[in-house]
């Protein structure tokens, strides 16, 4: 490192070069998060339900979390989405159109005891899943 009255340019250049050693900085600058994200940086996405799946919770919990496999409309990628709410899975059928969003885990990843599930179902055929579970709305017949 250089010291001195006129060393600012060298210090700045060295700092800019060293930043690339930080993996988070490098990923952010190269846009790798958006590249690997099935939603391509969007907050929500629409998809078609392929199948219902039950995913076992990680230790020490013991449960089968109800999820669905969804094929996104925008790019054809398949993701697993969690169905929040008591009995929510009963309102979702195969070939329904669902809106999914991030599940809200740390650093945009999985949440709690659900490994590999980064998304949750928000709407089914344009109607909020929470409204369906509460009984405030009815699922439209397509």
Swiss-Prot record:
Disulfide bonds: none annotated. GO terms for biological process: translation. Residues 1-44 are annotated as: Disordered. InterPro entries: NA-bd_OB-fold, Ribosomal_uS12, Ribosomal_uS12_arc, Ribosomal_uS12_euk/arc. Signal peptide: none annotated. Residues 7-16 have a biased composition (Basic residues). The keyword Ribosomal protein applies. Keywords: Ribonucleoprotein, Ribosomal protein, RNA-binding, rRNA-binding. One of its GO terms (cellular component) is cytosolic small ribosomal subunit. One of its GO terms (molecular function) is rRNA binding. SUPFAM superfamilies: Nucleic acid-binding proteins (SSF50249). Transmembrane segments: none annotated. Residues 17-38 have a biased composition (Basic and acidic residues). With S4 and S5 plays an important role in translational accuracy. Located at the interface of the 30S and 50S subunits. HAMAP family: Ribosomal_uS12_A. Part of the 30S ribosomal subunit. Belongs to the universal ribosomal protein uS12 family. This is Small ribosomal subunit protein uS12. It comes from Halobacterium salinarum (strain ATCC 700922 / JCM 11081 / NRC-1). The gene is rps12.
């Amino acid at each position: 490192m250089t010291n001195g009255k006129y060393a600012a340019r060298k210090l700045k250049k060295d700092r800019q070069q060293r930043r690339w050693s930080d993996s988070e900085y490098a990923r952010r600058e190269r846009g790798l998060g958006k590249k690997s994200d099935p939603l391509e940086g969007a907050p929500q996405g629409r998809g078609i339900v392929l199948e219902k799946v039950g995913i076992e919770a990680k230790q020490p919990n013991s449960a089968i979390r109800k999820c669905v496999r969804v094929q996104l409309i925008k790019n054809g990628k398949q993701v697993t989405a969690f169905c929040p709410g008591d009995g929510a899975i009963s309102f979702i059928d195969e070939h329904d159109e669902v809106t999914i969003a991030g599940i809200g885990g740390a650093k945009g990843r999985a949440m709690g005891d659900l490994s590999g599930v980064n998304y949750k179902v928000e709407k089914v055929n344009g109607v909020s899943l929470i409204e369906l579970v509460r009984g405030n709305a009815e699922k439209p017949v397509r």
